């Protein structure tokens, strides 16, 4: 099961239960979070909400809201998203060596999660997806690709040639579009609230959450 961007503490109520239902209904045996498990709105390089939570308050709430995810799916890979790495970027901007920075799993109270840039399962690569759409990335890398990042996109699309076939798939996300941290996207298309099941690297199912 591949779970979309959470952006905790701004994840949509009910998304965890939905993901659990999909995991059980397809008898899944592996979990991959596609990245941006936290939002880090307070430390954004863009304008932040003046009435929003301060840094420690947002972090503590994000940790609190990640705990049920970690309790439910303790063995998981997490591809590191642009929002996840925001604090690391701020540290680099301040010339702070990485030796001083905690690992993601330690800072977020998720000790058994594996945070990584890329996961490959059944010859399918899972990445967060800042570099473009899944349909273009799979062609660029000549490898089936599943990614997140683009909240409004949810699809699977095959590219078939004379000697090979690959697919690109967008997972969708689990964000609460009405949260203040998502105000920047108020005039964007609605987010696709969904997760994705990939079976043996060949069958891809986009599961949309009933809303």
Where are the regions that the model predicts?
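Short hydrophobic beta-strand that contains or immediately precedes a catalytic carboxylate
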Residues: 2-4, 146-147
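Core catalytic region of metal-dependent phosphoesterases/phosphodiesterases
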Residues: 3-107
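A generic structural signal for alpha->beta connector loops
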Residues: 73-75, 110, 123, 165
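General small-molecule cofactor/ligand-binding pocket signal
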Residues: 77, 111-116, 127, 169
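Acidic carboxylate-rich catalytic motifs and surrounding loops in phosphoryl-/glycosyl-chemistry enzymes
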Residues: 78-83, 114-117, 206-210
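Short, conserved catalytic or adaptor-binding loops enriched in Gly and charged residues
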Residues: 104-108, 159-162
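Short acidic low-complexity segments
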Residues: 105-121, 130-133
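Conserved beta-sheet core of the metallophosphoesterase superfamily
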Residues: 120-207
């Amino acid at each position: 099961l591949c779970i979309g961007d959470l952006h905790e503490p701004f994840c949509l109520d009910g998304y965890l239960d939905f993901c659990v239902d999909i995991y059980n209904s397809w008898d899944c045996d592996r979990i991959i979070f596609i990245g941006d498990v936290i939002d880090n709105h307070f430390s954004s390089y863009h304008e932040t909400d003046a009435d929003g939570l301060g840094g420690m308050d947002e972090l503590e709430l994000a940790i609190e809201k990640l705990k049920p995810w970690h309790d439910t799916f303790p063995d998981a890979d997490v591809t590191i998203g642009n929002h996840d790495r925001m604090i690391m970027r701020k540290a680099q901007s301040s010339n702070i060596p990485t030796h001083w920075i905690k690992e993601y799993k330690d800072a977020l109270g998720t000790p058994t999660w594996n945070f990584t840039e890329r996961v490959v399962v059944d010859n399918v690569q899972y990445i967060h997806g800042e570099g473009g759409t899944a349909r273009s990335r799979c062609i660029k890398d000549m490898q089936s690709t599943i990614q997140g990042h683009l909240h409004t996109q949810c699809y699977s699309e095959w590219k078939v040639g004379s000697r090979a076939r690959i697919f690109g798939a967008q997972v969708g996300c689990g964000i609460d579009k009405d949260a203040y941290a998502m105000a920047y996207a108020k005039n964007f298309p609605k987010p696709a609230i969904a997760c994705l099941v990939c079976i043996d690297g060949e069958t891809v199912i986009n599961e949309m959450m009933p809303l």
